[in-house]
Amino acid sequence: MIGTMNTADKSLIQMDLALRRRFSFTEMPARPEFLAGVTAFGVDVEKLLTRINQRIEALLDSEHTIGHAYFMPLKKLENNADREACLASIFQSKIIPLLREYFFDDYERIGWVLNDSVKAKENRFILLQQSAQLPSFSALFPKEIADSLSDRRFRINDNAFASAEAYQGIVA
């Protein structure tokens, strides 16, 4: 029997301890090389995953690197448009939510992992919301609190998922 478990998942600690007593474990690190030759949006997916994982390891640790399995559906797709749609879906429904969990919704750090700071605003996955769209801190809090806060309200840029430059910027 083969079972898999993400070592970063601490919510199942009792189950983890029980399994560790009963089974032997083999570490299965991410293997971006399994994605060699796969491209989408003009980006080598092996390099994309490698760069993302290098940044995650620098900011967190190797236990949080993203596995190649998330990207394996791309391998069976022949059509570039299908691969692009699949990669967008992987990022939107798997990678971004996973990064949100890893970084406790610290969107600034998520942006660092995705190298958003070097991209044009429209190609960033994470955007700082415009203050004009939101109530000011002075409208929300007493002056002494409002004056001490830095506006760090972020949002996901849904348009980036269909942007080649958004993915190309990750490996830049």
Residue ranges with predicted function:
Residues 1-172:
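C-terminal regulatory/interaction module of P-loop NTP-utilizing enzymes
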